[in-house]
């Protein structure tokens, strides 16, 4: 099992990042490159929880999302063709005095089979930089979307 810790500071509020994280509509891959529309299926969606299958490139994962705590979001693997039940993501948000937000993410990858075990080993060693890049790209994409929304709102006032 591999456990990866990621950190990034953003101009987004926790609510803005969570809004992007929990946007399961078309075009999700623009925010999260490892989640393509071909794999996306929303099984249930509530005010602070969702059950969603997503993935890309032959790897899929059914995740239970819980964002009932606005400073702590948990994604728990319910099923996958690669990852075991101990897998998932945890997002912790810390508001800073300067208005920015620190996002700390813990990704756990437990291989379910040989493919998962090998991928978990790769992710836990040389693959961390790939996960870091994907995480930063998602933060940047959500920042850009948020800025565009603010610009549109300012134009309509």
Give, region by region, the residue ranges found by the protein language model.
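Hydrophobic pocket/interface hotspot
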Residues: 17-21, 65, 75, 103-105
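Short, surface-exposed coil-to-beta transition loops
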Residues: 3-5, 58-63, 84-90
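Beta-strand/loop substructures that line and gate deep hydrophobic ligand-binding cavities in soluble
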Residues: 78-133
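Beta-strand residues in well-ordered beta-sheet regions across diverse protein folds
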Residues: 7, 53, 76, 104-106
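A short, structured loop/turn motif at beta-sheet edges
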Residues: 11-15, 45, 66-70, 92-102
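Hydrophobic ligand-binding cavity/cleft-lining segments
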Residues: 1-47
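Short amphipathic alpha-helical segments
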Residues: 13-16, 20, 126-134
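Glycine-rich portal/gate segments that line the openings of hydrophobic small-molecule binding cavities
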Residues: 25, 29, 38-82, 137-145, ...
């Amino acid at each position: 099992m591999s456990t990866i810790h990621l950190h990034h500071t953003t101009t987004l509020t926790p609510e803005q990042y969570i809004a992007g994280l929990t946007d399961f509509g078309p075009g999700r891959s623009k925010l999260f490159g490892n989640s393509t529309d071909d794999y996306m299926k929303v099984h249930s969606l509530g005010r602070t929880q969702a059950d969603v299958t997503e993935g890309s490139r032959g790897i899929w994962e059914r995740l239970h999302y819980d964002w009932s705590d606005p400073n702590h979001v948990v994604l728990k693997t319910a099923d996958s063709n690669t990852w075991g039940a101990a897998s998932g993501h945890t997002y912790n948000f810390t508001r800073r005095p300067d208005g920015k937000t620190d996002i700390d993410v813990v990704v756990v990858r437990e291989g379910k089979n040989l493919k998962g075990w090998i991928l978990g080993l790769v992710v836990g060693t040389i693959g961390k930089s790939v996960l870091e890049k994907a995480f930063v790209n998602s933060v940047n994409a959500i920042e850009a979307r948020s800025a565009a929304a603010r610009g549109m709102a300012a134009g309509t006032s």
